[in-house]
């Protein structure tokens, strides 16, 4: 039986295992034939969407991994706009609205409100939080 999943990632890109575990879980879901329609990054998890994250050359690049996963499997990557702005992860639209000189939301990520998460949860069979 194929299920539709939504993941909520609260853990930062580095510093805890939460985001990396979410990524590995996503790979396992897809390998088992399940559908993963959206990954919503909330609280500290919004840091997964920063284009300014530069891991050491011998470390796993989780931001790039999320981007590749999204491209390969057509998965939406959404960061909570309010949580992201508080933590300095800013998309083009928000940079313009707030008269900031730059944006740093990584390619493939979009910013959304909690309504985006609620919408995804309505159509999901399972919601898993990391």
UniProtKB/Swiss-Prot annotation:
Pfam family, one: DsrE
Matches recorded under Gene3D superfamilies: DsrEFH-like
GO terms, biological process: tRNA wobble position uridine thiolation
InterPro entries for the chain: DsrEFH-like (IPR027396), Sulphur_relay_DsrE/F-like (IPR003787), Sulphur_relay_TusD/DsrE (IPR017463)
Domain of life: Bacteria
EC number: 2.8.1.-
Top EC class of this enzyme: transferase
Subcellular location: Cytoplasm
Coiled-coil spans in chain: none
Presence of keyword Transferase: yes
Residues annotated as the enzyme's active site: 80 (cysteine persulfide intermediate)
GO MF annotation, one: sulfurtransferase activity
Keywords attached to this entry: Cytoplasm, Transferase
Any single GO CC term annotated in Swiss-Prot or TrEMBL for this entry: sulfurtransferase complex
Family membership: Belongs to the DsrE/TusD family.
Function: Could be part of a sulfur-relay system.
Protein name: Sulfurtransferase TusD homolog
């Amino acid at each position: 039986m194929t299920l539709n999943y939504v993941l909520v990632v609260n853990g930062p890109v580095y510093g805890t295992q939460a985001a990396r575990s979410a990524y590995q879980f996503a790979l396992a879901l897809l390998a088992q034939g399940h559908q993963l329609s959206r990954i919503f990054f909330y609280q500290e998890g919004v840091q997964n969407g920063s284009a300014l994250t530069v891991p050491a050359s011998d470390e796993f690049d989780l931001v790039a991994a999320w981007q590749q996963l999204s491209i390969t499997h057509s998965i939406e990557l959404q960061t909570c706009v309010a949580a992201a702005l508080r933590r300095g992860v800013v998309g083009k639209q928000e940079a313009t609205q707030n008269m900031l000189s730059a944006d740093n939301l990584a390619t493939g990520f979009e910013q959304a409100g909690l309504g985006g998460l609620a919408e995804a949860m309505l159509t999901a069979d399972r919601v898993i939080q990391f």
